[in-house]
Amino acid sequence: MNFETVIGLEVHVELNTNSKIFSPTSAHFGNDQNANTNVIDWSFPGVLPVLNKGVVDAGIKAALALNMDIHKKMHFDRKNYFYPDNPKAYQISQFDEPIGYNGWIEVELEDGTTKKIGIERAHLEEDAGKNTHGTDGYSYVDLNRQGVPLIEIVSEADMRSPEEAYAYLTALKEVIQYAGISDVKMEEGSMRVDANISLRPYGQEKFGTKTELKNLNSFSNVRKGLEYEVQRQAEILRSGGQIRQETRRYDEANKATILMRVKEGAADYRYFPEPDXPLFEIXDEWIEEMRTELPEFPKERRARYVSDLGLSDYDASQLTANKVTSDFFEKAVALDGDAKQVSNWLQGEVAQFLNAEGKTLEQIELTPENLVEMIAIIEDGTISSKIAKKVFVHLAKNGGGAREYVEKAGMVQISDPAILIPIIHQVFADNEAAVVDFKSGKRNADKAFTGFLMKATKGQANPQVALKLLAQELAKLKEN
C-alpha cells in the first residue's frame, strides 16, 4: 500500500525589538545569565505587564507579508502551565483571536514549479526562560529569554513531502527577514521549528495519527527528520501496526528520530483572557502605516534582477536568498557597479571567504563602495583578476580604498611597453636554453616565455599587453 505524506509546521520566530514584549529590559541575545531581567521578568508580586507597541508593529508586518487577515480587536490570553523557566506559571499568548489568520505563502520547489502553502494563524506571545543542567548536579534557570517577543506561525497541513517542508521554511525565512522583523538565526534560537507529520492511504480524506518532531536545529535536519519519519511510519503501517501520537526528537548523530514522550491527549492549558493586558483595536490607519514600511520582497527582487539587470534566474535566486547580501548588491549596483561582476564576486570570492572565516557579510570590512572600486580598477587594467583576489582579502579584513591600497602596495599592473620590452629582452638573456629551443622550432617552446615574464614582473604584467609584446619580440627573435 502506498501512503500520502501530510506535514504541517509550527515556527517560532523571535522578533527583533530592542526590549521585551511586556517589560522594558533588553531582548538582546548573548548577554550573561539573567543580565536582561527585571521585576516583571521575575514575576514579583504586584507587577503588571506593559505591551511594547513595536511587537504589535512587527506582528502586523508579518501578517501583511504572509497575506493574512488581521484581527482588529486585539487581546491576549493566559496559557497556564508550570515549568521552572516560567516563573508566573502561565504564558501570555493569544488563543482564539491571533493577530493574523487565513494566510498563504508561495514556495518554489526543486523542479522549478511553485506551490501555495496555507498559513492557519500567526499569534504573538512571550518566550520562556531557559533551563541548563550543570555537571555539579544542579539545574539553573536563565530568564534572559523570558519575555522576549515571539510570533508563532502555524501552517496548514498542506505539505506533501519533506522537500515541500524545506521549501516552505526557506521561503518563510526570506519573507520574515526581508520584512525586517527578525534575523531568523536558528543557531541563536531566533527561529525554531516543530513539525507534525502523518501518513494516510492515497485517496483517504481523514488524516492519520500525527507525530510531532522537535530538536530540529536546521532546515536540513527538518528535512532529514521528516524523511526518516516517512520511512518509519510507512514500515509500521505496512506491517499492520498503528502509529502512536507521540513527540520525537531528531538525533543527528544516528540520523534517526528518538521517542521523547507519548501523548495521551491534548494538553489542557486552561486558556482565558489576560486580565492585566487591556483590549485594544488595530485601526486601518495603523495597518496601512505598517504596509508602507514593508520592502520589496524576494520574489519581486528576483524578477527585477532578471528583467532589468540581465541576471540569470540562478544568480537572482542566490543573491536574494539572504537579505543582507541582496541589500549589499543593491547598494553596489546603485554606485554604478556592473551587476554581473558584482554578482560574480558576491557568489564567488566573497562567499568562499565568509565560509572559510565563519563570518557574515556584516562582520567583515568589505563595503559596496570598495568592491565597486576594485571591480573598476580591474576593468581599467590597473590590476589583474589574479591580483584582485589578494586585494579583496585585504579589503575584507581591513577595509579602505581599493585603488589607494593597490598603489601603496605596489600592485599596479605594468602596461607600459617602454617598461615591458626591456624586461622581455632580459628574460631572453636569462633563459638562453629556451631561446635555443624556440629558434629550433621546438613545439610549445614559446609558451615557456609567458611564465618567465610573469615571474620576472612578479605577476604584475598586464596579461593582454604583455602577451602581445612578447609575441612581437619573439617574432623579431626568430628572424635574427
From Swiss-Prot:
It is an enzyme of class 6 (ligase). It catalyses: L-glutamyl-tRNA(Gln) + L-glutamine + ATP + H2O = L-glutaminyl-tRNA(Gln) + L-glutamate + ADP + phosphate + H(+); L-aspartyl-tRNA(Asn) + L-glutamine + ATP + H2O = L-asparaginyl-tRNA(Asn) + L-glutamate + ADP + phosphate + 2 H(+). The keyword Electron transport does not apply. Its EC number is 6.3.5.-. The keyword Protein biosynthesis applies. GO terms for molecular function: asparaginyl-tRNA synthase (glutamine-hydrolyzing) activity; ATP binding; glutaminyl-tRNA synthase (glutamine-hydrolyzing) activity. InterPro entries: Asn/Gln-tRNA_amidoTrfase_suB/E, Asn/Gln-tRNA_Trfase_suB/E_cat, Asn/Gln_amidotransferase, Asn/Gln_tRNA_amidoTrase-B-like, GatB, GatB_C_1, GatB_Yqey_C_2, Gln-tRNA_amidoTrfase_suB_CS. GO terms for biological process: glutaminyl-tRNAGln biosynthesis via transamidation; translation. PROSITE patterns: GATB. It comes from the Bacteria. Pfam families: GatB_N, GatB_Yqey. Disulfide bonds: none annotated. Keywords: ATP-binding, Ligase, Nucleotide-binding, Protein biosynthesis. Belongs to the GatB/GatE family. GatB subfamily. Heterotrimer of A, B and C subunits. HAMAP family: GatB. Allows the formation of correctly charged Asn-tRNA(Asn) or Gln-tRNA(Gln) through the transamidation of misacylated Asp-tRNA(Asn) or Glu-tRNA(Gln) in organisms which lack either or both of asparaginyl-tRNA or glutaminyl-tRNA synthetases. The reaction takes place in the presence of glutamine and ATP through an activated phospho-Asp-tRNA(Asn) or phospho-Glu-tRNA(Gln). This is Aspartyl/glutamyl-tRNA(Asn/Gln) amidotransferase subunit B. The lineage of its organism: Bacteria, Bacillati, Bacillota, Bacilli, Lactobacillales.
